[in-house]
């Protein structure tokens, strides 16, 4: 089974949050996309959800899911601060 932990954590600043949120792995990214994400539509958002799910199932790498998460952040104008 592929690892769902990222080589490097990300820190994102979501609207309305007082400080940055650290995202360390695919499961955490999936939760943030599903429960906290400010924009729940768009191609990059859908792809990020799909790649996170695939990584959790062992069907793609965590690094691929991380790239998809970063694309969703760009699409939603979510600041990546680290």
Q: Predicted segment positions?
A:
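A short, structured beta-strand/loop element
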Residues: 13-50
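Short, charged/polar N-terminal "headpieces" of proteins
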Residues: 1-12
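Short, compact, well-ordered microdomains
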Residues: 52-82
């Amino acid at each position: 089974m592929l690892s769902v932990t990222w080589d490097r954590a990300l820190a994102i600043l979501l609207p309305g949050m007082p400080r940055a949120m650290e995202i360390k792995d695919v499961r955490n990214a999936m939760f943030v996309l599903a429960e906290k994400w400010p924009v729940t539509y768009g191609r990059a958002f859908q792809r990020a959800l799909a790649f996170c799910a695939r990584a959790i199932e062992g069907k793609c790498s965590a690094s691929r899911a991380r790239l998809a998460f970063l694309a969703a952040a760009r699409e939603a104008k979510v600041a990546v601060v680290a």
